[in-house]
Amino acid sequence: MWNEAVPLTAEDIEEYKKKTYLGYQPTPYELYIKVLIDTFGDQVEDDFSIQLPDGVKDLKYQKDAVIQGYQMLMQHNGLFLADVVGLGKTIIATMIAKRFVEANGKNTNILVVYPPALEDNWRNTFKLFGIYKKAQFITNGSLSKVLDGKDNYKDKEEFDLIIVDEAHGFRSDSSGKYDELQKICKSPCINMGLLKSSQKKVMLLSATPLNNRPDDLQNQLLLFQNSQSCTIDGVPNLKGLFSEHILDYKRLMRERDQRDVTSEVDKIYEQIRSKVIDKVTVRRTRNNILNDPDYRADIKSQGIIFPNILPPNELEYVMDSDTSNRFYETLKQLTDGKTDENPEGKGLTYARYRAVEFLKPEYRNKYKNAVHIGQTLAAIYRVHMVKRLESSFYAFKKSLRTLLRITTDMIKMFKEDKVIIAPDLKVKELQAKNMELDEIIEYAITKGYAAEDILFPADAFTSEFLEMLHHDREILEQLNADWEKENDDPKFDKFQENLTHNFFDKEINPSGKLVLFSESVDTLNYLYDRLTKEIGRSDVLMVTAANRNRLEQTIKENFDANFDSDSMRYNIIITSDVLAEGVNLHRSNVIVNYDSPWNATRLMQRIGRVNRIGSVAPNIYNYMFYPSQQGDKEIQLYKNALVKLQGFHSAFGEDAQIYSKEEIVKELQMFDNNVKDSIDKKIALLREVRELYNSDRKLYHKIKALPMKSRVMRDTGKHSGKSIIFVSSNVKTEFYLATTTGVEVIDFLEAVKYLKAKPEEQPVPFSNEEQHYKHVNSALAQYTTEYVEAADTSSINRTDLDKTSLEANKFLRTIKQITADSELKLQCDVLMGYINEGIYAQLPRYLKALSREYKNDRAKMKQDEYSLQNKISELLGEYQTMNKEQRHDAQDISNPQIIISESFK
């Protein structure tokens, strides 16, 4: 060996040093630009171009969204595409999909998931961009067809990219459709394309991904992230990060009746936004686009207008004293029922919906959580009745008559000693058709029901239940009689007044088009009759779920500004929320919300129908019929919606008032008056490094090629004794701030505040190298502790898991102990790995429920070993994901590197 050795000279050593961080001293500016290059990656040099189909505008902000989104897709296996309503999410998603197909190869398969109303939009857009044959399309309620192999759908493992439109519909991880989607998203890819990835990519589209709670965001993130092996910078444990925010949010929701909690809800969502959302979300508001000079010039040159959404206009109606008294007394009866919390209540109990709650114990056993089910149904119906009262007196009277009828029918069942409980059978509807009870029972048996499962004698219920039914009937008869005397409708009078003098004023409504939304179809029928028959308007179009598809062409001709036709056949469209998504109504710039939706994000979606690319009016007017003071007192509709909407604004940086004049849109100030929020700041930083790339390519490539561990010492007169360290692996990057007291993770924008430097600034000699190395090593040690060790599922701290996961794991370990079957033991190990990594939401819940059947009875488990083996095997088939080696390769963070470090004198 020594005979083959080559002698090294001092010159050789110096030459080798030049190739390492020891051989070249970068300037602070060069290190700053190096961080921008590494952070923005392909976004800087990306020369992405696509042949746009005829009729599709070439918009710079959309192309940049494609570049950013594709990079997130590659880095995190998924993203939120959450540009505000009307900025072209479908087009952007399709361009990302086309780019993915080009990168991954001809065998790429895409699954597009959407609400039924959006099917044509997706199919047509994919055809337009030439990737229709690469995709299969499915409505969001039909995902079981993929899992069951029906209707010629490919196996879930054959899809490489999943696109989910209106993804906020999958916010609840306890729903069946969420479980189905998660199984599809987390299953491995068997077609190893050119990208050589066995992990699916997932695009979640929604202008409103936050619906009500922090849980909603967490659940959607878990469609493409695992809780324990999260790829998002600064998040070692996704559920761990969210759990504190979820608890705080629940506490604030309990306290909101007593005090204003809006600012505290803001803080929760601001933290979620900065720690998580910004890193996996492509989201631009209209303000973000207008704040960027390149984007602003681009849309101006193409004649695109972004209308101003003006503050909501309140339409308050005044009731006379007789109507007001009737209204208030009715609310009292609707909401003041006797409950455990309100034992003195004398109002409606909604007993008709609480039958299972009052079964005697020996009959109630077949219903799990019977008391909870009954009380929940009663609460839902109470809210429903108050909402109907707020919507229109007509709708409320109709619901009042229905509730009286079904309550009377239940009393009739008691008299005949034949009480039927079968929710799926729709007994109330059959009774409404005058079917006798014996006929209903015979009908149920033909449908596969056993008589003993649905038919109960009167004495199967506690005596209290029949008393409650009689109590409710008495109140309902009085209310019905009282409301039959009410012939006034001050709300409609207010609407008609504005229809005559305001809504069609050319100063505010140049196109002469009006859009009205109501949650209640009964209210729409009432309005349509009065508008057409009483007022005599022939230009009113009513759209509901029943006729939406049939009227699609008519809607486009009369209300879509992008459509060739400018028909004036219909100038008023009154509709339910069936048109709140996936349709253009932007020939209009005036929206009337006849009632306020319980789901506050619907308000954003409604306004989004008229605030779209192609809008021609300079302003958008948003009229609201607010709940009366009495209604607000009882159900706090206004306050609930405000809290939820403000939470959404804080998390996503919305750009307009939606609900009330009190609502303040967050202008999230960063560094100067021209930059409004973190998205603006990142766009500005990307523009800065792109300008260097375009103006001085030689310097750009020199900086890009700086070696790992490049370092600099600065003397700026501030930050004395601090260091910034940038650590990265194949999966995750982190910025650390190190001081004499320790190290802490900071986000990219915070790091940039320290690193930003001008080209002329020069470095200073290292005055304390020992401290610098200590800072660097401390940062590397923290990264290793938080990510490298945590990524080893065998070393996961059991306290990181929730109680359900711990119980599921305990059950699986017990199965391993009672069986000698090596295959069953291996299957249990695989499932425990899934649970430890937080891959599936419903898997631990299912195992927990299964464990409750055995109550830790090992003898019974041993006796049922064959059955348990089948169930465990079925679970593995259902909850299938990449094997351990594939997951390790996809999430390998075992070799972290120091990219740069910077210390301050």
Per-segment meaning from a language model:
Residues 1-84, 91-103, 107, 175-182, ...:
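ATP-dependent helicase/translocase motor core
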Residues 137-170, 174-200, 204-207, 216, ...:
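Inter-lobe coupling linker of SF2 helicases/translocases
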Residues 47-51, 55, 97, 299-319, ...:
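Conserved Helicase C-terminal RecA-like lobe
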Residues 90-95, 106-128, 211-215, 519-524:
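Conserved Walker A/P-loop ATP-binding site and its immediately adjacent core
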Residues 171, 208, 532, 536-634:
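Conserved RecA-like P-loop NTPase helicase motor core
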